[in-house]
Amino acid sequence: MADAWEEIRRLAADFQRAQFAESTQRLSERNCIEIVNKLISQKQLEVVHTLDGKEYITPAQISKEMRDELHVRGGRVNIVDLQQVINVDLTHIENRVGDIIKSEKHVQMVLGQLVDENYLDRLSEEVNDKLQESGQVTVSELCKTYDLPGDFLTQALTQRLGRIINGHLDLDNRGVIFTEAFVARHKARIRGLFSAITRPTAVNSLVSKYGFQEQLLYSVLEELVSTGRLRGTVVGGRQDKAVFVPDIYSRTQSTWVDSFFRQNGYLEFDALSRLGIPDAVNYIKKRYKNTPLLFLKATCVGQGLVDQVEASVEEAISSGTWVDVSPLLPSSLSVEDAAMLLQQVMRPFGKHASATVFSDTVVVSEKFINDCTKLFSERMHQKAEKEMKNNPVHLITEEDLKQISILESVNTNKKDKKDERRKKATEGSGSVRGGGGGNAREYKIKKVKKKGRKDEDSDDESQSSHAGKKKPDITFMFQDEIEGCLRKHIPDAPEEFISELAEHLIKPLNKMYLEVVRSVFMSSTSASGTGRKRTIKDLQEEVSNLYNNIRLFEKGMKYFADDTQTALTKHLLKTVCTDITNLMFNFLASDLMMAVEDPATITSDMRKKILSKLTEETKVALTKLHNSLNEKSIEDFLSCLDSATEACDIMVKKGDKKRERQILFQHRQALADQLKVTEDPALILHLTSVLLFQFSTHSMLHAPGRCVPQIIAFLHNKIPEDQHTLLVKYQGLVVKQLVSQNKKSGQGEDPSSDDLDKEQHDVTNTTRKELQELSLSIKDLVLKPRKSSVTEE
């Protein structure tokens, strides 16, 4: 019952409070959100939404929670982890990081992580523990262990050296931290090891062999060397090729170098390299800086050796001999170094040194070279005289002709020589109206002009300038021939020297040979001056005779048909016309010192060579004459011949009736004399046919053997029937004999043709007997006395 009343009193009290309480207004959640957003937009409230959108958080609270989280995590936290813990956007975290770093100096931002000094102190303690345990730690290993950048870690550890970390940083390699005990231990090892070294040793090999820390080794080694604790030097710096050279070795080395140089007078760079001296050139320069030395490619030579070579060279030059300096030099000296040494020795002589270097080591005086040249003097004269006789057209070059022409113009007045030539020509052929009959014509024109006749006063200068532009195109001797002669003269000379000397002598010998050729031609020209006078007279007479013969031969050809005339024309151009052309060219060649003994030996190429050396005025006429030999017209050839004789100042006597009768008679007699002595059936038939043609037509004929059938056919109605029948029969036998001979030569040694050979032999014997029986009768057709006509006489 009492409990019920207690409950009633409690309810009455609650009701009374409710009656007297004031009423309050409550906002909905939506209204709250709108109000907060309004305040944020008006910048009256600065709060940040959480990622789930259920809460607002102030920037100050974010900073507080970041500091708390950094402390909880031991002084190092990643900002990504902070974003997950605080549950706000990463941008707000990054914005507050800058404020924290500014307000708290002991906090730093490293690789997206907040790190404070407490963490770095604990890290330094851990590093110190490792350092004391191993004696050294490397920053690179610490970077991998703690995932921090090397520069940041080096800076942080450096600040704590001596305070937290009991060690010191290598000054040369700031990536290593040592303890004093470690450095002292290594220093003692390095000192002991290098104190025991007695020869140059590569430092790099010791690092790998004894496990030294490379940078520490170089630092300690340099310190020990600089303080004098170690006697030696480090060559090559802090590189893979660094070498430690102890003083005891250097002293031994220097003693050996001094002794070798004193005894031999030179030093080899390779030998010094084998001694452990890497830069031999600089070593020698420092060692012998007050000693005159000559540095070559692979060696260094002292003044004593240079003086010895120089004395030998001077002796060779003064005595007019040669010397090979290689025996005077050490055998280890290369050919290239010997050549460089000799070049230095020859330099004081300057450009006027009367010596030449062969094979790099052989010095030859100019006097010796001249003596070698004189060995070939006699042979030059012999060869020049022989070549002049054999083929002078190809022996003398155009340049030689210019120079010879200059020499002639110096000794002879141009006008007097021209007048003298005209006088000689007149004496040899008679006056205009005398000697050739009333109808004779004579042609006279200017003498052939030669290049080089102008400017006589400057002949030497022009000669030298031309000689420099055009080399001789003749060869005296080949190199192997010259080498053979030199071996006999200097048997003790090296083979390479002989070869180079021969090559050196080729041009001078060819030049001398050219001078000898000129001299031979000039002497030959001077000795045959009187003979030339007769030559001009004889030439004009011979040209006139051949000219008239060609005219008469042309007249005889007109009795035949066109095809036969063509064959006769070609034959005449190839023989008589070519002979008269060669006479003309040989006449001009005599003025050019290019004449040959027999004009018949002049070929087409030789005529072209002569043409190339003529003046333009003469060349035009002679070129047309040369080209007309390949044409098919005698009239064109004679027209060109008239122009050529006119250009060459050759007077040609044109024949009259009396002259023609004399030529006909002489030609007939010449053919008859030849017919009397010959026994060749083919030639008998040929000569008889031509003579019968002349008897019947009173015209000369110059025909080849293949035109004999046409001549016999022409004579059918010109001679008695019995004579023509005999001639035709003889012709058949001649043809039969020729066919038989051709068959015999064509069969050769064929065994299957024995029977045919026997039969052919019988036929040939029969034919030969018949020809022998008829030959006398055929000759009698023209040789037997007969009545002569008036025109034949």
Swiss-Prot record:
InterPro entries: Ufl1 (IPR018611), Ufl1-like_C (IPR056761), Ufl1_dom (IPR056580), Ufl1_N (IPR056579)
Stretch list, region Mediates interaction with CDK5RAP3: 490-683
Annotated disulfide bonds: none
Phosphothreonine modified-residue sites: T535
Enzyme class label: transferase
GO cellular component: cytoplasm; cytosol; endoplasmic reticulum; endoplasmic reticulum membrane; mitochondrial outer membrane; neuron projection; nucleus; protein-containing complex
Ranges where the record places region Required for E3 UFM1-protein ligase activity: 2-212
Role this protein plays: E3 protein ligase that mediates ufmylation, the covalent attachment of the ubiquitin-like modifier UFM1 to lysine residues on target proteins, and which plays a key role in various processes, such as ribosome recycling, response to DNA damage, interferon response or reticulophagy (also called ER-phagy). Catalyzes ufmylation of many protein, such as CD274/PD-L1, CDK5RAP3, CYB5R3, DDRGK1, EIF6, histone H4, MRE11, P4HB, PDCD1/PD-1, TRIP4, RPN1, RPS20/uS10, RPL10/uL16, RPL26/uL24, SYVN1/HRD1 and TP53/p53.
Name this polypeptide is given: E3 UFM1-protein ligase 1
Gene source species: Rattus norvegicus
